[in-house]
Amino acid sequence: MRYCLNIEELFQDIDFYDRFKAAKEAGYDNVEFWGWNGRDIERIKHECEINQINITGFKGDLDWSLCDLASRDDFIEWTRKSVATAKYLGCDSIIVHSNSIFEDGSSDYSDQY
């Protein structure tokens, strides 16, 4: 079993990239975080290397849905990019949801097709 910290929720008082070191100093070898978009992937890799931290998972989807024909291609392309990013970071899993959630909390596209 691997224990990991979600550095998105912990150490919020310090810069995101400094949280890898903080996790190591707290005694952990594994971290997870939410999305990788908008983040400096090279810096994440560097922080993992210098702090000997592994990434066990991150969110690999955005607001598109595999169930929505209008955004399916975007969803698939982003998932491919997420897999490539995970491989680059040495991460062996990503979290991908098949549906985006509407503002009312639903995710049913059946009325559109």
Go through each PLM region and give its residues:
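Conserved, mostly hydrophobic/aromatic
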Residues: 5, 23, 31, 48, ...
